[in-house]
């Protein structure tokens, strides 16, 4: 029974492979090559997670990354396929800026950031990456920005006002 539920839960997630990289460890006898994989998973409805896996073979690295991504999922409050307000995120040398966009705009984002936004269920957004464009750091900065986004209900609760007063 538990396996069936886990299989169903896994099936409704979108998975995206962002990057595969060959890395090496230098030892006395030469080099030992291995592979790293960066992946994101999401349900297309506000849940998103990223994973980074490392193994001697590419498929094993991808599988490890997918498992880590499923374990590290966060929930993001979305507003009809876009963001509630402009947000900034940063991780090490990478900084990202994202702002809500009107219906029909699409996802204006590059590379790794686009993959995160697609699996999270964001359909209309304007974004820009500053500083380092290392895919790992961009993914982490994007997830950081999305987790710091507040819905009007959260802001209203914090300020002790109603949602209508917050929206103006």
Curated annotation (Swiss-Prot):
Swiss-Prot/TrEMBL GO biological process terms: translation
GO cellular component term of the entry, any: small ribosomal subunit
GO molecular function, one term: structural constituent of ribosome
Domain S5 DRBM: 13-76
Disulfide links within the chain: none
Signal peptide: none
UniProt KW keywords: Ribonucleoprotein, Ribosomal protein, RNA-binding, rRNA-binding
Domain notes: The N-terminal domain interacts with the head of the 30S subunit; the C-terminal domain interacts with the body and contacts protein S4. The interaction surface between S4 and S5 is involved in control of translational fidelity.
Purpose of the protein: With S4 and S12 plays an important role in translational accuracy.
NCBIfam families registered for this protein in UniProt: rpsE_bact (TIGR01021)
Protein family: Belongs to the universal ribosomal protein uS5 family.
Quaternary structure, from the entry: Part of the 30S ribosomal subunit. Contacts proteins S4 and S8.
Protein name, as recorded: Small ribosomal subunit protein uS5
Phylogenetic lineage: Bacteria, Pseudomonadati, Pseudomonadota, Gammaproteobacteria, Alteromonadales
């Amino acid at each position: 029974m538990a396996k069936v539920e886990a299989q169903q839960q896994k099936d409704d997630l979108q998975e995206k492979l962002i990057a595969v990289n060959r890395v090496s460890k230098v030892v006395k006898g030469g080099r030992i090559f291995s592979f790293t994989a960066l992946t994101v998973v999401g349900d297309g409805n506000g849940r998103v997670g990223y994973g980074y896996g490392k193994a001697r073979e590419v498929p094993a690295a991808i599988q490890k990354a997918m498992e880590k991504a499923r374990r590290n999922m966060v929930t993001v409050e979305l507003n009809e396929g876009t963001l509630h307000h402009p947000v900034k995120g940063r991780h090490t040398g990478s900084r990202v800026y994202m702002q809500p966009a009107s219906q029909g705009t699409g996802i204006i984002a590059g590379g790794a950031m686009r993959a995160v936004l697609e699996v999270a269920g964001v359909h209309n957004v304007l974004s820009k990456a500053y500083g380092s464009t290392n895919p790992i750091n961009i993914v982490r900065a994007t997830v950081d920005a999305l987790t710091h986004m507040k819905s009007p209900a959260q802001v209203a609760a914090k300020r002790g006002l109603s949602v209508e007063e917050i929206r103006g």
